[in-house]
Amino acid sequence: MEINGVTIQMLPAASGDCIYLEFPDSDFRMLIDGGYAKTYQKYLKKFLLKLAAEGKRLNLIVVTHIDDDHISGIRALLKENGDSRNPKIIEIDEIWFNSLNQCITSRNAEQGMSFAVKIILKSMCSTDIDFECEYKKQNISYTNGKNLAELIQAGGYRWNASVVDNLVSKGQIVQFGDLKITILNPGIETLTKMGKKWLYHLKQINSNNIEIT
């Protein structure tokens, strides 16, 4: 499908999303979410290999949710793609993804994250914790976000590099050449609420005395 010169392709992702946008005039390509892992294996991998064979790259990947039907396909891609400097599938310039650690950082930006919270975050690296997202009314797993963050770091990908404070948030306008992207969501309020809820669950499952205000 093409709208105003922009190519839009929605790959099969069942209940999730996997959306490809190409802006020919700006020579810019963006992937929004990756659906399930099977979305990657059945559809996305072949699609990206074709792009790479044409000499194209992904300028930006945007991960909007940490639910399986949005994030798992991206995890599968990064796991197979490997090192960003020598990718096995396709070159990726940058990834936008707010990890839970960044949500906590947004809440503590002014007061600073306490040493106790930092220690607990490190200690929880191998633990699965589910909590109810106030806005989505469904359980989402910290493990999804943690694993993606690890893959981004291990592959040396540019992570939220073009946004202020490395946090994708409402109101920012990001320029890629002559292409301008205005970020509509999430707002800082949403991010800080998620961070506060995460800290609450850390407090419930740890013996450490953490005061949450």
Residue map of PLM features:
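Flexible, acidic/histidine-containing loops and adjacent segments that form or flank the divalent-metal
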Residues: 1-6, 81-213
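Conserved beta-strand hairpin/beta-sheet module of binuclear metal-dependent hydrolase folds
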Residues: 2-57
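Active-site environment of divalent metal-dependent phosphoester hydrolases
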Residues: 15-17, 37-38, 66-72, 102-104
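A short acidic (Asp/Glu
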Residues: 20-21, 70-76, 106-109
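Structural recognition of the beta-strand scaffold that forms the well-ordered cores
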Residues: 22, 29-32, 59-63, 94-98, ...
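Active-site-proximal beta-strand/loop segments in catalytic clefts of secreted hydrolases
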Residues: 34-35, 64-66, 100, 186
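Active-site metal-binding motif and surrounding structural segment of the metallo-beta-lactamase
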Residues: 42-95
